[in-house]
Amino acid sequence: MTRNGGPPGRIEHGFPHLDVVRASITALFRRLSADGIRVYDTSFAPADAAFGPDEDLHLGAHRVASAMVRALRLPDARVVVAFRPMEEAATVELASGPEYFVEVSDRFRTHRADLAAALAHEVAHVLLHRLDLRFPATADNEILTDTTAAYLGTGWLLLDAYREDALTHQKFGYLTPEEFGYVLARRGRLLGEDLSAWFTSPRAYEAYVRGRARADRDHRRAPLAAAGTAERLRYARARRAGTTPGRGSAYRFEEHGAGRLVSFPCPVCGQRLRLPVRGPVRARCGLCRTVLECDT
């Protein structure tokens, strides 16, 4: 895992990986099921990530790693943590298990507060390895790993480790701060969780708010009934013309023997739904079982 995914001194912002992030959430639902996702309803506790003032470094690292393993529901996995000089924050050896070796940078000997963030990413790698869930491209796999950590309750630590000011530039993981906020907000909406009070980094909280605003927009896209006026007007024009909307539109019209259909992604899991174009309708997503109010 890298400490800073961008050029030295520069941290990337915005939502450049959003398509892969959304695909990652869909992949998690398909692999774990809606009930399997809801098992991860409790985020990693701040107390489990903290080091006591007199706590031994190695014992504390193994305590945090063990708590991370429990949080990600890996009951038979064991994570062994070792420190060494390295440029990356951490790396994991993905063997057949049940024992996995994680190497972390020596800088965590003094910056212990961020050790749990580094372990969150690496233990998420272990979970995905166990699930046999991966994307073809290495870069996309790293996005999948960060998304998995955030969506299943441990990755908020990666965002909280983000620092950016005149003297400090620090970011763990491969998602931008805003993308971490986006994933955490989608998790929060699903499970009724609000992490606002957990962030110790003001910049992390600001990124979380920006990500949450972007996640909220997913629930206001046509043909969802909650779409705003401008969005509804654009949808109505495209529906009358029978044309595929421009780039950036989530919905697509399809001709079918029984009439026209509109397809669009579920705002919760990303699975595409196909509904008849006929006005107000209530639909249940077959993957996450969310009931959606729509106006097609």
Q: What do these predicted regions represent?
A:
Residues 2-19, 23, 171-296:
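Pan-zinc metallopeptidase signature
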Residues 16-44:
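N-terminal, Lys/Arg- and Ser/Thr-rich interaction peptides
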Residues 33-97, 107-112:
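Auxiliary, metal-adjacent structural segments of Zn-dependent hydrolase domains
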Residues 116-133:
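Active-site recognition of the HExxH zinc-binding catalytic motif
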Residues 138-173:
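Post-HExxH zinc-binding segment in Zn-dependent metallohydrolases
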